[in-house]
Every structure is written in C-alpha cells, then in structure tokens.
Design a protein with these regions (language model features):
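Bacterial Sec-dependent N-terminal signal peptides
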Residues: 1-34
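Acidic, glycine-rich flexible loop segments
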Residues: 127-170, 177-178
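Short beta-strand element of the conserved SAM-dependent methyltransferase core
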Residues: 66-68, 118-122, 176
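Broad, structure-driven detector of short, well-ordered beta-strand segments within folded domains
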Residues: 47-50, 60-69, 106-108, 128-133, ...
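N-terminal export/targeting and maturation segments
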Residues: 29-95, 184
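Short, low-complexity, Pro/Ser/Thr/Gly-rich segments in the mature regions of secreted, periplasmic
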Residues: 175-191
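Predominantly extracellular/secreted and cell-surface proteins with exposed
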Residues: 89-137
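Intrinsic low-complexity, intrinsically disordered segments enriched in polar/basic residues
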Residues: 2-11, 101, 109, 183-186
C-alpha cells in the first residue's frame, strides 16, 4: 500500500514540478516585457529615424526626417512625427493638436549646419541630438542613457494606469546602437 501511494505521489510530484517550471518561465518572460500586446515593427517607413511604442495599444509614433522639396532638411522643423495606427489597419495619421503640443511632439533647435537639439514636449529631461553621420551621410538621433551614447532606433514607454492628462509612466526603454561598441543595446530609464 505504501509503495502504491509513493508511486502516485511521485507522479504527482513530477507533474507539479513541470507545471511550476512552465509557470515560472512564463512569469519570467512577462517580467521582461510585461505588456500583453505584441508590437509590430515598422517597416519601409521613408526617412524614419526612430519610433515610439507604448501601452495601452499597438499604435506607433513615427519620427522621420522632414525634407523640403529641394531635398534638404527643413531646418526650422527637422522632424515630422505621426502615427501608424496599426489598430486601425496601419493607417497613417497626424498627431492631434493635443498630442503634438503636450505628449508626443518634438521641439528642435539648430546647433550647427547639420546638427539639431531635440526634446520631447512632454519630457524635457531627455535631450536628443539629430545629426548627419559621415559614414552613411544620413541623419540619426542620439541620446545618452545610463552613461551610454545610443543611436536611437526605438523607444518603448511602459504605462500602468493614470489618466489621459497624467498617465502613470513606469519606465522608458531606449533600444539602438551603442556608439562605443557598435552593438545593439536596450537601456531602461525609470521616470
């Protein structure tokens, strides 16, 4: 009788161990990306320098070089920003006035002929630099996060609750190329 009970308990213990392992792996994966959403990667976006994705939906803010008809950068407004509304069949849509002036808009100031200082209207503590790089003769955006200079490709903003005017932003992750190692990195900033 004891042997039979032991065999049943042994099988139960094995099943429980496997279940605990599976659940803990899922929790670990969720802690790396706690958002339940799957974010698409923007592709073939003309003159895009970086993009922002954030909770609570998959719509993506695109930041692209604003070229004039003559092919030169518009020095008074070097970045044009807009939505790719993936939740609405990938429709391109300009930011609303409120989004442009209080949330996702970018302010710029020329610092020299091919370089601009940028900052988000909603978070002025993160200075960005837009400059043309000699190696590819294209514009790129750079930022310093955690003592690392990063050529920005994407920013993810984790939002947990709050309101329209005051979202509860937990952190932002900047992904791009580390200027010193030339490797892809992601750095998190607590906000």
């Amino acid at each position: 009788m004891n042997k039979l009970l032991f065999k049943k308990n042994k099988k139960l213990l094995i099943v429980l161990t496997i279940l605990v392992n599976i659940i803990s792996q899922n929790l670990l994966a969720q802690s790396k990306n706690p958002s339940p959403l799957h974010f698409p990667t923007p592709k073939n976006i003309e003159n895009m320098v970086f993009y922002i994705q954030r909770d609570p939906n998959i719509n993506t803010a695109i930041y692209a070089i604003n070229y004039q008809e003559n092919g030169k950068i518009d020095k008074s407004n070097p970045i044009k920003a807009y939505w790719i509304r993936y939740a609405e069949k990938g429709e391109k849509k300009d930011f609303s006035y409120i989004q442009r002036k209080f949330a996702y808009g970018i302010e710029s100031k020329a610092s020299n002929n091919e370089e601009f200082e940028l900052q988000f209207v909603s978070y002025k503590k993160l200075p960005l630099t837009l400059k043309k790089i000699d190696s590819d003769q294209k514009y790129h955006v750079f930022v310093n996060v955690n003592q690392k200079k990063i050529q920005v490709e994407k920013i993810f903003v984790r939002i947990e609750g709050g309101s329209f005017w005051l979202p509860n932003v937990k952190y932002a992750e900047v992904t791009g190329i580390d200027a010193s190692s030339n490797k892809t990195i992601t750095e998190r900033m607590l906000l």
